[in-house]
């Protein structure tokens, strides 16, 4: 048994607490004690070990107790696990099934476990990948002589975001995953005896999976809601935090911004127990996060709980994290007469290191590409024959700088927009444009043209939800000029949901640029 599976087994079997899952159909919470979840994991491992040939295991479906147990079940069986998203609303079921099974097959998955309607959709597709009923597997009889399998060297095949290019698969070892989880537990001072976790994050995303595993390894109770339940009604997140009296939660900037923006609709919630609210997975909007903290203060939310962080799938998840109680700290810089505010994202967790390296692009003093290394790093990308050594520095593609050892991220190097010699990061423009009436929140992309640096033009694409396109377009241009000090060459308004996104919801800026420029 690998070190991660052993640590998971010890935590689950010894915990007096439970996994509590929201059933989206009945809208009720269902509790399953952690020892019972591990019992299902052993059953799933027994089912997997009955197969003549066993490669990596794929998981697709709502986050039921059985699906969560299957993650540990794969590790007990000595194989890696990979999770992929359910079909999006409006997707053709057959096309989704074939695409998903091709993706699984391409990374070495030969057995997929699923349940419900997704199981039936996958089973109807023609594929060499074996499709198994997750619910039945969780009920497989086990003998006291179940033999845990040796470490395969791979725990997770984790898809990367692909927001600036084609998604790749990071190969994560059991030791790397365990190191990352322990680093988080140490930094956040998580205690299974007193902490309670609540999440709606997708488990196929590195932040959602890391949140789950950190909660399990600390031995705390976890309330897990399907991502679709949040998407349908984002303000329910506040209700779930109140109902669970959670002390620990996490979400992308978008989630906090939605609650802050529509806080007038929040009623009768108690957020007084919450001591850690991680904001990660996408650039932190300081104004939006502050708006959330201020709006939720009457409901007991403490500003010290705001925890902006930095991470990536290639490092399992977390790279930097503030210490408990630091709250949202902001660094202000003035460049070309324009003031910018950036969140401090904390220092590296135990086992991780970072440095700022020089880039080819002109930049302010101390600003450069973030490079990382450490015990949480991936073994490499699947199929990459070049490999990497443990001590190698990994270039993240993110541009940032340090403030007293705390990391600040400005943006992605591939996405920098250069206008008249000035470097502009897309989020600076997007966060300002998103505040205009008629623009869908979280539906703005700023890109530069393909021209040379001196002649580059700023282009903005925004999803339109207003009444008058001309009024909204003019308002976006005026606000960007006023706040950012740059004039957009064009503002393209698009139907809601039309901007391309990754499976985790991140906007694909480079694809938007290709569309706008033909």
Show where each model-derived region lies.
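Conserved AMP-binding/adenylate-forming
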Residues: 30, 46-88, 194-202, 277, 284-406, 413-416, 423
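N-lobe entry segment of adenylate-forming
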Residues: 1-51, 71-72
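AMP-binding/adenylate-forming catalytic core of the ANL superfamily
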Residues: 249, 374, 379-380, 399-484, ...
């Amino acid at each position: 048994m690998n070190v991660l599976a052993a640590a998971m087994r010890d935590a689950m079997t010894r915990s007096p607490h439970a996994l509590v899952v929201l059933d989206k159909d009945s809208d009720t919470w269902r509790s399953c004690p952690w020892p019972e979840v591990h019992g299902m994991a052993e059953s799933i491992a027994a089912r997997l070990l009955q197969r003549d040939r066993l490669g990596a295991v794929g998981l697709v479906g709502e986050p039921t107790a059985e699906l969560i147990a299957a993650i540990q079940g794969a590790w007990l069986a000595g194989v890696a696990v990979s999770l992929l998203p359910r079909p999006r609303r409006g997707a053709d079921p057959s096309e989704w099934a074939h695409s998903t099974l091709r993706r699984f097959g391409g990374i070495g998955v030969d057995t997929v476990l699923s349940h419900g309607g997704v199981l039936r959709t996958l089973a109807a597709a023609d594929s060499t990948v074996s499709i198994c009923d997750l619910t039945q597997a969780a009920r497989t009889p086990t003998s006291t002589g179940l033999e845990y399998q040796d470490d395969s060297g791979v725990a997770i095949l984790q898809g990367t975001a692909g927001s600036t290019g084609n998604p790749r698969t990071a190969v994560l070892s059991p030791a790397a995953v365990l190191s990352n989880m322990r680093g988080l537990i140490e930094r956040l001072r998580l205690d299974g005896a007193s902490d309670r976790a609540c999440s709606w994050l997708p488990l196929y995303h590195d932040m959602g999976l890391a949140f789950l595993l950190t909660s399990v390894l600390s031995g705390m109770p976890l309330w897990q809601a399907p991502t679709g339940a949040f998407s349908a009604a984002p303000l329910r997140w506040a209700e779930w935090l109140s109902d669970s009296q959670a002390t620990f939660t996490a979400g992308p900037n978008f989630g906090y911004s939605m609650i802050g923006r529509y806080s007038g609709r929040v009623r009768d919630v108690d957020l007084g127990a919450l001591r850690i609210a991680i904001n990660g997975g996408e650039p932190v909007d300081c104004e939006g996060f502050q708006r959330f903290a201020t709006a939720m203060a009457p409901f007991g939310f403490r500003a010290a709980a705001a925890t902006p962080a930095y991470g990536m799938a290639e490092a399992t998840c977390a790279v930097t994290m503030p210490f408990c109680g630091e709250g949202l700290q902001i660094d202000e810089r003035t460049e070309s007469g324009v003031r910018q505010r950036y969140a401090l994202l904390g220092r590296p967790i135990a086992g991780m290191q970072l440095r700022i390296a020089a880039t080819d692009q002109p930049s302010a003093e101390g600003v450069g590409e973030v490079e990382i290394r450490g015990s949480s790093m991936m073994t490499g990308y699947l199929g990459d024959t070049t490999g990497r050594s443990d001590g190698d520095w990994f270039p993240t593609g993110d541009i940032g700088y340090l403030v007293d050892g705390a990391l600040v991220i400005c943006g992605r190097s591939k996405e920098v927009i250069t206008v008249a010699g000035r470097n502009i990061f897309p989020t600076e423009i997007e966060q300002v444009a998103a505040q205009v009436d008629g623009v869908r929140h979280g539906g703005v992309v700023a890109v530069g043209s393909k021209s040379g640096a001196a002649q580059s033009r700023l282009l903005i694409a925004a999803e339109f939800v207003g009444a008058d396109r001309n009024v909204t377009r003019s308002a976006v241009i005026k606000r960007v000029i006023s706040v950012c000090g740059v004039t957009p060459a064009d503002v393209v308004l698009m139907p809601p949901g039309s901007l391309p996104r990754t499976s985790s919801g991140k906007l694909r800026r480079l694809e938007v640029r290709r569309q706008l420029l033909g």
